[in-house]
Amino acid sequence: MILQNKTFDLNPNDIAGLELVCQTLRNRILEVVSANGGHLSSSLGAVELIVGMHALFDCQKNPFIFDTSHQAYAHKLLTGRFESFSTLRQFKGLSGFTKPSESAYDYFIAGHSSTSVSIGVGVAKAFCLKQALGMPIALLGDGSISAGIFYEALNELGDRKYPMIMILNDNEMSISTPIGALSKALSQLMKGPFYQSFRSKVKKILSTLPESVNYLASRFEESFKLITPGVFFEELGINYIGPINGHDLSAIIETLKLAKELKEPVLIHAQTLKGKGYKIAEGRYEKWHGVGPFDLDTGLSKKSKSAILSPTEAYSNTLLELAKKDEKIVGVTAAMPSGTGLDKLIDAYPLRFFDVAIAEQHALTSSSAMAKEGFKPFVSIYSTFLQRAYDSIVHDACISSLPIKLAIDRAGIVGEDGETHQGLLDVSYLRSIPNMVIFAPRDNETLKNAVRFANEHDSSPCAFRYPRGSFALKEGVFEPSGFVLGQSELLKKEGEILLIGYGNGVGRAHLVQLALKEKNIECALLDLRFLKPLDPNLSAIVAPYQKLYVFSDNYKLGGVASAILEFLSEQNILKPVKSFEIIDEFIMHGNTALVEKSLGLDTESLTDAILKDLGQER
């Protein structure tokens, strides 16, 4: 196989050669991720599995489907991207996830968890209809099996018996480690040809026996299966092989050969170590899952920690403060306790905070039930993952107007994770739902007040959003004030045009305001605060101004400017309104500042756009 300037011979019979390939791949992953940041530990842990897959299968005839795909770095290196891997997660460089537009070897876009088996079932159905050779091969992590879509796909797969290989990469994040010699012996038995042949023959024999005898024989087989791993999968009609050592290339190759011959759905349970090959990261799951640039020798971050709290920290600190005084506060997250800041609250009040795993729909529905019972559930969730729970928001929270509180983290452009993780949709779909209150803070201090308002709001569901990393508005520029339902805040009154900011858009609008002032153009500045309900006095507030310019980190369609235009139209008020929201396309990965500049959302571009609209030149 040609890797641009590298040539590797992936001979499945040359285990020593494959091990050298694995070491080369690990070295390259460490070299690049230490410089760029990325998903390190999962990618290091999956190297042997991916090398084994490529050694035995042509991935263009047997599509490789990577669940979430943050573990697919070795796959990228083995498919012509060894040299360009240095651009990983950089603006206009390689994506940190599989991306068909980047390479024909990347079968499917990925970034969210638990979709691989469902995709594989779809591929298998299509292959059967086309009478195509080959079968899909899905590599998924053990965390992925907590989501409902995984079981929905297994249900059909076990019933239809489509040929498909699933490799369950168990790095001890969710699945218990088998214990003792019996488990090891049964594993060797189950992955061997004797066991598979035995199972096949027993099934054939049982099918020929009279019903009375068949019942006793079936009970014998059930007893045999109960002492083996993987009973659950076998009961669904999925062949189970394992556990195997996911770093033992001999075991991987032999197991994949067996799975290939079965021509049925097979799940291979492979145990791996996250961070394999980098001692500092081995076994330290949370710290080394997603990392920024770091020193390869010491493991220390190359970026010094900011003295200013991140929005996530400001949120979680405030929630902890409130939780100490209010026993009705409960916290819910979907497999992201650290990312959403709930880890410290779980430590303080473990009985009142719930990590429901990768189950966003369940998070929202169960939270709605807790709200009905008088509790105050704060559902802490990334914007990109909230969209997976849309029906639960509508059906279970909003129809009954149950006062759940949606704390929407990573709202707006998120940077290096790209299309699958941008937090740009929540504004548009949430504002369309009756009974939903939607608001946004402009900085850390108003975020703290937003949490306090949400805690007291008890008449309906509410949602507030905040960005990744930091707000655009520096702390202390404007005095913080509390939230009052449906009230905006006019931060600067003087001017002929009005800049309207929503959430993080206030900071962007303020920077433009300062730039225009240097051009002797005075602008008023409004912090919209509430998107739903809008300030009932909005028509009076905007009346003195000739033009309105709207700034917000969300899609333009169905966004903040749309809401303002709808409101003014109902009041029979005609005002020129220009939106500086996100254009109607999926936004690529890269440094946030570079991405914003490419979209014309940096201060210089925004200032020029307003000057042009006003008929002036810079």
Curated annotation (Swiss-Prot):
Mg(2+) binds at D142, N171. GO terms for biological process: 1-deoxy-D-xylulose 5-phosphate biosynthetic process; isopentenyl diphosphate biosynthetic process, methylerythritol 4-phosphate pathway; terpenoid biosynthetic process; thiamine biosynthetic process. InterPro entries: Dxylulose-5-P_synthase (IPR005477), THDP-binding (IPR029061), Transketo_C/PFOR_II (IPR009014), Transketolase-like_Pyr-bd (IPR005475), Transketolase_BS (IPR020826), Transketolase_C (IPR033248), Transketolase_CS (IPR049557). SUPFAM superfamilies: Thiamin diphosphate-binding fold (THDP-binding) (SSF52518), TK C-terminal domain-like (SSF52922). GO terms for cellular component: cytosol. Its cofactor is Mg(2+); thiamine diphosphate. Keywords: Isoprene biosynthesis, Magnesium, Metal-binding, Thiamine biosynthesis, Thiamine pyrophosphate, Transferase. The keyword Metal-binding applies. Belongs to the transketolase family. DXPS subfamily. Homodimer. This is 1-deoxy-D-xylulose-5-phosphate synthase. It comes from Helicobacter pylori (strain ATCC 700392 / 26695).
